[in-house]
């Protein structure tokens, strides 16, 4: 541990990171990073690490092994988790709370093409039964409309969540997906 590093508790470090990234990330991404950093901070506390200055390459390696083996994360999830931890440590290095070399030494899991694809599919028969049920008992409910849109368009769930009333064209009728970066 370097003598010129500040003593910053892991939970305080999380707050510093989220404040620093507030302007750079969308609300949803910031929330995701918060969950990922919270998992890392909790693990650090379980390891009796009370200052971020104590975190080194071996600490991050042990966390990665813990997430993979004990928490059962798949490679693509682990890559996202460790990538966020690396960003976290870079921000902390910028405020002298972590040795700057730690973040740069982190090796991310390699995800081969196709490993990041979720192969789960909703079978046609199941989808039709669900839609029939919703048509009869929950017509025009949020669940009904969401399943109907997903089934008819093959849209990703993230796209569905991003839809706004202005995306519906009554003339066509059609839905138009638009990227809406956060307003500053």
Report each predicted region and the residues it spans.
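DNA breakage-rejoining catalytic core of tyrosine-based enzymes
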Residues: 112-129, 184
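Short, surface-exposed helix/turn micro-motifs that flank interaction/cofactor sites
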Residues: 86, 161-162
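Short alpha-helical hairpin
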Residues: 4-17
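Basic, Lys/Arg- and aromatic-enriched nucleic-acid-binding interface segment
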Residues: 124-157, 161
């Amino acid at each position: 541990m370097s003598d010129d590093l500040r003593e910053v508790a892991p939970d305080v470090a999380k707050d510093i990171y989220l404040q620093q990234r507030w302007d750079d990330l969308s609300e949803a991404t910031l929330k995701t990073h918060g969950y990922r950093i919270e998992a890392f901070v909790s693990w650090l506390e379980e390891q009796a690490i009370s200052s971020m200055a104590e975190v080194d390459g071996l600490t991050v390696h042990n966390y990665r092994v813990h997430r993979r083996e004990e928490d059962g994360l798949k490679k693509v999830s682990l890559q996202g988790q460790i990538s966020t931890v690396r960003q976290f440590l870079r921000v902390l290095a910028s405020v002298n709370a972590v040795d700057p070399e730690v973040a740069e030494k982190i090796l991310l899991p390699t995800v081969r093409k196709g490993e990041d694809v979720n192969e789960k599919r909703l079978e046609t028969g199941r989808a039709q039964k669900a839609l029939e049920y919703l048509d009869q008992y929950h017509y025009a409910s949020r669940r009904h409309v969401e399943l109907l849109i997903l089934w008819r368009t093959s849209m990703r769930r993230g796209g569905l969540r991003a839809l706004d009333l202005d995306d519906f064209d009554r003339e066509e009728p059609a839905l138009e997906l638009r990227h809406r970066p956060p307003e500053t």
